[in-house]
């Protein structure tokens, strides 16, 4: 029998996670996250007790799990983070720059998440710093914030970096310098430089035997297959998105809060679920 009804992410985990775990043996950090989601605001993480000073009425509130991966826990931390960031954002133009890698790299990145996510940050930062300091483009030290996203709009695996870039910077004399309202870096140049820097990090990790290969990435243990992968990625035009999307500092930090306190499994994306009894 198949039953369909509206549900939350917590409902889905409560109904299906136990059988999923038996079939798939997920790693410890996945099991921990599942436990947090299933037990959030159930009393498993303790309670808060409030007593009215006037009438003595007692209210008991179950604590949240406070896991970053729990879609029920992020609204308050998001607002708290936004408030803390207000002092770090200038009243100046900001630009949204997204650094994306080809899908061909997904399996090897998934097998080496810590190393190759770090490489994404390194390559994006080095690209922005190098080009911004070039007098041909700006000739200044810029400010930016990088945020890693690991999923796409279809909730597929899609690692990429969102970067909020200040539309100007400080020159060698610590004086403000900008380009008068337009973004100072050509999109095509950003893509090519980022591609070169990320691929250099990937090759360096391979040469130092620091990469692991699991699942569909196992074939890249072979040096010939790995070189084929590199060649294919060098031939591609890496997609870089650049656009001024903000109207003032407050819009910037609100946007950042949405990305730093959000995961793929938000409840509104999972309105209905099918339950099959076996």
Report the location of each language-model feature.
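Beta->alpha loop/short-helix hinge microenvironment recognizer with preference
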Residues: 1-272
